[in-house]
Amino acid sequence: MTARNPDVAAGAAPEADLTGWVKEAFTASGFTYDVYRKGEGPGVVLIPEMPGIHPGVLGLGNHLVDNGFTVVIPSLYGTPGAKAVRPGAVAVMVRGCVAKEFSAFATNADRPIAHYLRALARDLNEKTPGPGVGVIGECWSGGFALAAAVDDSVLAPVLSQPSLPIGLTAKHRADPGLSEAELKVIDRRVAEEGLCAIGLRFSEDPLAPGARFKTLKNRLGDAFEVIEINSKKGNEHGFGKMAHSVLTLEVREVDGQPAYEARKRVVEFLKERLAPA
């Protein structure tokens, strides 16, 4: 069972700043990004949601550190430490939509950023204990976590509200977020190594379509654990119709709150998969 943060009010999502995070540039696959590192223990790559490493992402990062992980957060977009809702956030999202590394509108896409993230995962695995690393993707980056698991170093992919490709058509909404060639590697790892993943979404979230989860569930079967939180009108916990960020903005550290319980499950999953032999 994971502990509550005593500094967070029950009615607020956990947040943090960059205190204690060490920045270092990492270059791979033709890209260079600053990467923020903190903690000791098995490694977890935490890929930020749009519009970047905001205080909610850092709150999640600190929670993982407190639970015994080494966490690295690549700054793929935005201004690290800046608020999620701020002037300039829309411009960050627009740039993301046209950046070739993200291929935001492409189906069956082998995204260039996935190659960078695999290299980052391998590097983290070499520097941390345990049999491999976890990768958490959120929102824009949600599907990147599964694409990263093409590399054998990734043992615990977590897809939180995966939003790419942007759901313009039924084909886009049903797309798994990675190429067929990449998905075949995941299939093989599931069959031969017992790889498994967790996917999280709110039931009414149009940005993380249910059709995408259906595609992944049909393909991966029991290896894809789905956590879907009820956000229908009148739901018991008062989630709004646009509830989206399962592990950050919607978490309230109260037992029984679904996003809080989902975060507990993610930590449990990481510990199960990454425990040193």
Predicted segments — roles?
Residues M1-A277:
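N-terminal cap/leader regions of alpha/beta-hydrolase-fold enzymes
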